[in-house]
Amino acid sequence: MAYSYTEKKRIRKDFSKLPDVMDVPYLLAIQLDSYREFLQAGATKEQFRDIGLHAAFKSVFPIISYSGNAALEYVGYRLGEPAFDVKECVLRGVTFAVPLRVKVRLIIFDRESSNKAIKDIKEQEVYMGEIPLMTENGTFIINGTERVIVSQLHRSPGVFFDHDRGKTHSSGKLLYSARIIPYRGSWLDFEFDPKDCVFVRIDRRRKLPASVLLRALGYSTEEILNAFYATNVFHIKGETLNLELVPQRLRGEVASIDIKDGSGKVIVEQGRRITARHINQLEKAGVTQLEVPFDYLIGRTIAKAIVHPATGEIIAECNTELTLDLLAKVAKAQVVRIETLYTNDIDCGPFISDTLKIDNTSNQLEALVEIYRMMRPGEPPTKEAAETLFGNLFFSAERYDLSAVGRMKFNRRIGRTEIEGPGVLSKEDIIDVLKTLVDIRNGKGIVDDIDHLGNRRVRCVGEMAENQFRVGLVRVERAVKERLSMAESEGLMPQDLINAKPVAAAIKEFFGSSQLSQFMDQNNPLSEITHKRRVSALGPGGLTRERAGFEVRDVHPTHYGRVCPIETPEGPNIGLINSLATYARTNKYGFLESPYRVVKDSLVTDEIVFLSAIEEADHVIAQASATLNEKGQLVDELVAVRHLNEFTVKAPEDVTLMDVSPKQVVSVAASLIPFLEHDDANRALMGSNMQRQAVPTLRADKPLVGTGMERNVARDSGVCVVARRGGVIDSVDASRVVVRVADDEVETGEAGVDIYNLTKYTRSNQNTCINQRPLVSKGDVVARGDILADGPSTDMGELALGQNMRVAFMPWNGFNFEDSICLSERVVQEDRFTTIHIQELTCVARDTKLGPEEITADIPNVGEAALNKLDEAGIVYVGAEVQAGDILVGKVTPKGETQLTPEEKLLRAIFGEKASDVKDTSLRVPTGTKGTVIDVQVFTRDGVERDSRALSIEKMQLDQIRKDLNEEFRIVEGATFERLRAALVGAKAEGGPALKKGTEITDDYLDGLERGQWFKLRMADDALNEQLEKAQAYISDRRQLLDDKFEDKKRKLQQGDDLAPGVLKIVKVYLAIKRRIQPGDKMAGRHGNKGVVSVIMPVEDMPHDANGTPVDIVLNPLGVPSRMNVGQILETHLGLAAKGLGEKINRMLEEQRKVAELRKFLHEIYNEIGGREENLDELGDNEILALAKNLRGGVPMATPVFDGAKEREIKAMLKLADLPESGQMRLFDGRTGNQFERPTTVGYMYMLKLNHLVDDKMHARSTGSYSLVTQQPLGGKAQFGGQRFGEMEVWALEAYGAAYTLQEMLTVKSDDVNGRTKMYKNIVDGDHRMEAGMPESFNVLIKEIRSLGIDIELETE
């Protein structure tokens, strides 16, 4: 394989044994593809597919007026250009969006004509609000903050059959039910009650007999019975009663008479149970008629009404039970044929027949009225109203939609072959659902598993945005209908009819405040990616935490390869919020699919198919790690497989599919944990979750022991700068990279230059620091897709969340008791876990009733010293180091005029004293914060004069833009002249500056000319002259284009900012805070091994090895066995080997060994100890040297999950590094120099510093605010609150009998207002006594008791 620019600089030793059949897909595809389909940006009218915005418009339009004389049709839409780019939106706090313009056509029909002749057509583009755009990393910028829309896992539309698991009725009888769930519209439930009648509920309202619904659909009793039952036909001839025999129906019954064949031979004796053998004999004998006694009919149900042959009068209605009296009437009327329902107790119960018996309605109208009463209780029903209501419930496309998914699931479940059909229900649909339900009750068929991923689908961003958009459009539709009637008479245009506010409001509400629109977790690249790949069962139309039971949260066999079984939050959301598996994707119906390799006759092919949970059920699927021979055939006699959602073993020839990769089971975060296979699942869960909380360190450090997924995550997360096109690095500095694009990648008319501006010290959503550092040097050749700059937590294009620390597992003076961590001072000195946090502080100047607030350096009653960090505009300098209480932005607010004494008035008149009528409301640094000002932004309202600071910031930004554009022009111009030089040198000239006719042009001549003079040359070859003219035109066009671009940017910068009403100016100050690691900070490994730093010891006191190398961290070995995360020990061993190999390479470099020796040693590391072979021969000597230099700190290893390094390989690596194979060494106590009594496990573990810093939690209150009602101090760090002295603490003091301390706690230290002030006065006077009074909260209690109407008085002595 060819290595990329960064890969060949540092190759990871890969221990995987299985080949890569398929690359890991782009990890953000689920977000980007979904929203791309929703917008269909760039599609022409003909190319629009029936999805997304287009589908939403088509479902609501055309809108026809109430009279039918005017209609508004939808033609198409187009998206405009965004006003600001992403970075500008974040700065200005606006939404990154594009205007949506819809072309609609207003048609007015001629009222007089009979055939609706068209009288007038008007077409117009209407503005329909703004649609947020997705950034290239799958996020949205809403009001300046980056947000993610999480995908939702919800119950798929369709029909589901279930039972109550015996919970409803005390007998434990299973009550079956069916539920038709549409995509939008009313739910329809059918359910059995304990008496085996079928009921129907609409939208979970009160139940009605199911036959009411069938009657309302227009079925008569007889048609209903015909649909559900077969009939037995009896012929009456005089005194004999003959049954038309269907032998199968007799099975299981007891013969009430002897059953004989045609010859009179008895087949079944009276009183015997009829078995399958008897039935076979009857079929062979060809018995078609069976004589039965008349009482055989008693208790049977009539299937067709019995009519008097002579008079035509109805003797018995259908669905009536036959009794003796009825039989007598039948005999008297000489009826010759009776049809009864065939029912039995085993597999054909009389459920529908029983339901009809309890049904009080007898015709369609009564049934419709009954349904109307249930849906609209209290309203008087009319025939029309009842019909309209029922028609709208399930049969109107506007109110009811199963959607394509719903129809597909519906048809599949009830056994139809076609998967497409209408979105509304039909009579047949309802009958078929009832038939299936009755079959399941009869024991034919099974109920559905609601947690099966074939019954749950994923709703992505695009689909949810489309639904919201439709909601907005439906609101618009109502208003448009009202106005259309006016349009006929008043000649309105489409623009006057459509008010886009409801649409804009619906979209804004969805992106701004929906439960699934979340503030992006931007701690580090992994947390971003995981957030975008999250799948939540909560949210609108989903579950709620309280109602979700264990089953929904549990891991289901169908999760395999679709949803990660490991990564989910701990706590109330466990199992409801999941993460997509590495290779999973959604299909067109929204079901999750996983890829598999096709296996034919035990030969594994490279053909890959994606299957959903339903499609894979019948396949026999082998694991990715199944043993294959050289030809790719399965060799084991029995292969471990998955079949019908069970794990089992099968012969190789039965296998039909095979997993693509061992990591397809887990999510991205879990696939980053090396030796995951050796960790307990609970700890792996914590490990996956804690990696997302790692704070990016000052200098990222790649993990020595990784899994090979680090590069994918860093590349796909979007925090690195990736080359859009290949080329040569023209210039590079800390803030940008300029690439001169290779000629073969430049398309005509495009500039052959790419400028990448790097993000420097920017604040993330979590206040961590986003900073990019270039990796390339001037003159380097890069290809498309190479990584040009590292972002936060990335090191040479690999994810690097923490630091490699030398750890020893040993108890140490109790400092690492219970997961505490003992750190060496060296870690702090080397800034290994130093992180930068950026805080944004905002100062807003408003227009108040008494006058405008002013931002100024002239602040009353403030000394010079406090102002020395402010400029003349009153804003702090960039680079100032500030601490708590320092003024960042000086601001004064006018305060109300006070009554002045005559003397004051006189002084005021003489000295022009103005200071007393404003108060100081400056922005100060909050308590507990100290840092450096790294940036200031000033936003000024239109029409308000800009201050000097705002103007200087604007000038700086313009200079930067101008610099970029000049650079671009310089490169384009340079490339053009290079091409011209190649064409001109050696060609003959006709004329030119200081040139004779016919002279050959040389390099020296061209160098002597100014570039503008080149175009004055006249060549003998006309093609060359044409080339010169084209080049001149091209250069001037580019210049013009860039000037226009500059003017556009300048206009944007100089226009006023769109601020909230009443706001004149906003100043944002950004503080960078450096946080070193300190006791109380939380740290963790990748295996769920978390702990808190308890002590930082001097280096000389730490345990060290025989060479004197001290360890960085001492961990407690007791944290391993009970937690069963042995992965951390294996990681430590392999880390030791990796570091040892690096040191060996370092020694070779220091001894200046030959490159061949180095190459040989690298070959030993990479290609002789298991795992994947690396092709080192394609690297030149210089590249080998560069690689060796990068490996000095340790040879990075990859041990992919479920396919990682084996114990023997770790030992071999340790041996190669000349280290003990046990991974243990003798350590010495740094304080005494004595050797510890047994060898200790020492190695390198990758440790993370989590975003739970003691600085953010530690807090102490001095004098602060009090609660208004209880007069007690507030609680919490944010309110500068006190410590709660709670109920249990009071008990403790009571138990000790510390009465005075307790009294002090409950009165003067809390809410005794008078006592507090008195105590303050006493202390000032040097008197340290206290007098306790009445606590305020006691007065509140008395007031509350009085409010209950109980008079309570305190007796005074």
UniProtKB/Swiss-Prot annotation:
Q: Which GO terms describe its biological process?
A: DNA-templated transcription
CDD domains xrefs: RNA_pol_B_RPB2
Q: Which SUPFAM superfamilies match?
A: beta and beta-prime subunits of DNA dependent RNA-polymerase
Question: What EC number(s) does its UniProt record assign?
Answer: 2.7.7.6
Q: Which UniProt keywords apply?
A: DNA-directed RNA polymerase, Nucleotidyltransferase, Transcription, Transferase
Could you tell me which InterPro entries the record lists for this protein? DNA-dir_RNA_pol_bsu_ext_1_sf, DNA-dir_RNA_pol_bsu_external_1, DNA-dir_RNA_pol_su2, DNA-dir_RNAP_su2_dom, DNA-dir_RNAP_su2_hyb_sf, RNA_pol_bsu_bac, RNA_pol_bsu_CS, RNA_pol_bsu_protrusion
What is stated as this protein's family in its record? Answer: Belongs to the RNA polymerase beta chain family.
**Entry's NCBIfam families?**
PRK00405.1 (NF001616), rpoB (TIGR02013)
How does this polypeptide assemble, per the annotation? The RNAP catalytic core consists of 2 alpha, 1 beta, 1 beta' and 1 omega subunit. When a sigma factor is associated with the core the holoenzyme is formed, which can initiate transcription.
Q: What is this protein called?
A: DNA-directed RNA polymerase subunit beta
